[in-house]
Amino acid sequence: MSDPCWEQCVSCLQNELPSQQFNTWIRPLRVEESSTLLLRLIAPNRFVQDWVNDKYRTRIEEIISNSDAGPKSLEIAVAQRARAGFEVVRNAKVAPAVPVPDPLPSTGRDESSFQPPKGNTSADYSGHSDLGFQSPHRRQSPFSESQERFTQPLEMSRFGSGRPSNERSNEGAIGGSTESSADRERIPLQGVVEDLFKPTKNSNDFVEPRSTDPLLEIESRPIIETVSPRDIQDFGSQLTSRVKKKDVEGGIQHKHNLNTTFIFDNFVVGKSNQLGLAAASQVAENPGGAYNPLFIYGGVGLGKTHLMHAVGNALVQRKPGARVVYLHSERFVADMVKALQLNAISDFKRFYRSVDALLIDDIQFFAGKERSQEEFFHTFNALLEGGQQIILTCDKYPKEINGLEERLKSRFGWGLTVAIEPPELETRVAILKRKAESSRMPLPDDAAFFIAQRIRSNVRELEGALKRVIANAQFTQRSISVELVREALKDLLALQDRLVSIDNIQRVVAEYYKIKVSDLHSKRRSRSVARPRQVAMYLAKDLTHHSLPEIGDAFGGRDHTTVLHACRKIRDLQESDADIREDVKNLLRTLTT
């Protein structure tokens, strides 16, 4: 018989489970009785009945209790024609009582394969015109106080453990319920389990894994020859890593991994990062809004991770129960590989798609990893349509990431993309003063300016240099001065002096503009040579301690007024010409890193 409640449940499970699991365990179930109080399902044999009770019962009960038909009790029985015990009839064909529609044809737009179970959330759905992406399934932000977040009945901390767990839980869509009797005999099933999982010639339910992606081959490993119910339980227990302490709502456990020392209050703002700070502050105030996703890019050690953690900490402080997860992109890949190995990809999807905010650092690590990009693409779509905030960081503009799919690059630009530039002199001094104050070590202005003038590349190296100075002052019991800074950083300063000599500046500039070093010394005045020469003079004045006449002599014996004109010209062009500004920034990074 057909039942709308069961049809809805089947549709949800088909979206959540891998096709192999769905076709093997869910499709054979049929409805024998359905009323306002009871839903009675019939399994073709005892083997399927026990497996569904052990692995899927809690999830089925959750879906039917939230369905339009209202709460029902669930009963799963065995067909009368099946013998008692565990019998597997080879080549048996059990026609499903509930028709399962084939996947809809492509509409030309990439969609997430994950659909939240109907009734699990009271969120309203609306389009999202801010991102230029209209969807009838888009929910409001999960941080809205008027909205209830749905919880999943699966306990898990992370996908980190590949060892079988001895603990048994009564909850879980894949690994819940108490274990079957331990005294059941081991039953030879050689070839039988293979029949359960192996597609027939006429079946199109399974797709051959792409040979270009070795990760997919994990799913096609051989089936064990002899199994028992105890074996199956032990295997199922490996799918997820259990936690001893249950969540208050019995849902998935999310560890945020945030560094609580990275907050907005201790972020030093300057011209180079003020746009990034403003965007991050707006996201913290209105997560899931117009700035979703927020994509922050820039060089190493410039504060991208600090801003990301600051947003996460602000969200948790604002709503302590918020499911905020921070991780490096490498961790996402490792979790996915572990889920494939344990055949727990559905758990992986449920974990990452049930967060309120997902913060992923160094997204460029996905480059060249096709399977990881595929999974992240669907996770990205599911979170975005659910109104859940996404924050990503990268070391370069998304369009410049080689090995990243175009559909991901385009989606990264749906929200707001901001750049973090290397800090200017005043910001570097402010950072040094703030760090010295937190270390309770007075830092004179002249010493701070000396360090800031010599360390330009990034904040991380700046802080490292300050730590060396403070340690030297404490060990020698001296106050910090320019002389002490010279002593503490003498090896670093000597190396830097070698790297930023006029000769090295000329070589780097010539390579950057694809001209010869001799062209910089020549009398040629064509634009293709004159502009690089002016840039090289500007960098020599900015990075070295040579006088204007000395710099002029190094560029073919030019007058000091020519050098002064070049410095002023490049300084002015940086305000009006984005190309010159980008060239100077790239050359500074090359010369000072």
Swiss-Prot record:
Residue numbers spanned by region Disordered: 97-186
What Pfam families does UniProt report for this protein, alphabetically?
Bac_DnaA (PF00308), Bac_DnaA_C (PF08299), DnaA_N (PF11638)
**One term of GO molecular function:** ATP hydrolysis activity
Region: Domain III, AAA+ region; residue ranges are 257-473
- InterPro entries named among the record's database cross-references: AAA+_ATPase, Chromosome_initiator_DnaA, Chromosome_initiator_DnaA-like, Chromosome_initiator_DnaA_CS, DnaA_C, DnaA_dom, DnaA_N_dom, DnaA_N_sf
Q: Where is this region: Domain IV, binds dsDNA?
A: 474-593
In residue numbers, the region (Domain II) covers 71-256
Which CDD domains does this entry report, sorted A to Z?
AAA, Bac_DnaA_C
Q: Where in the cell is it found?
A: Cytoplasm
Q: Name one GO biological process term.
A: regulation of DNA replication
Q: Which UniProt keywords apply?
A: ATP-binding, Cytoplasm, DNA replication, DNA-binding, Lipid-binding, Nucleotide-binding
Q: Where is this region: Domain I, interacts with DnaA modulators?
A: 1-71
Chief subcellular location: cytoplasm
User: GO CC terms on record?
Assistant: cytoplasm; plasma membrane
Polar residues bias: start-end ranges: 113-124
At which positions is ATP bound?
Answer: 301, 303-305
**Similarity comment:** Belongs to the DnaA family.
UniProt note: domains = Domain I is involved in oligomerization and binding regulators, domain II is flexibile and of varying length in different bacteria, domain III forms the AAA+ region, while domain IV binds dsDNA.
| UniProt function note | Plays an essential role in the initiation and regulation of chromosomal replication. ATP-DnaA binds to the origin of replication (oriC) to initiate formation of the DNA replication initiation complex once per cell cycle. Binds the DnaA box (a 9 base pair repeat at the origin) and separates the double-stranded (ds)DNA. Forms a right-handed helical filament on oriC DNA; dsDNA binds to the exterior of the filament while single-stranded (ss)DNA is stabiized in the filament's interior.
PANTHER family hit by this protein: CHROMOSOMAL REPLICATION INITIATOR PROTEIN DNAA
Subunit-level organization: Oligomerizes as a right-handed, spiral filament on DNA at oriC.
Q: What is this protein called?
A: Chromosomal replication initiator protein DnaA
Q: Could you tell me which species this protein originates from?
A: Teredinibacter turnerae (strain ATCC 39867 / T7901)
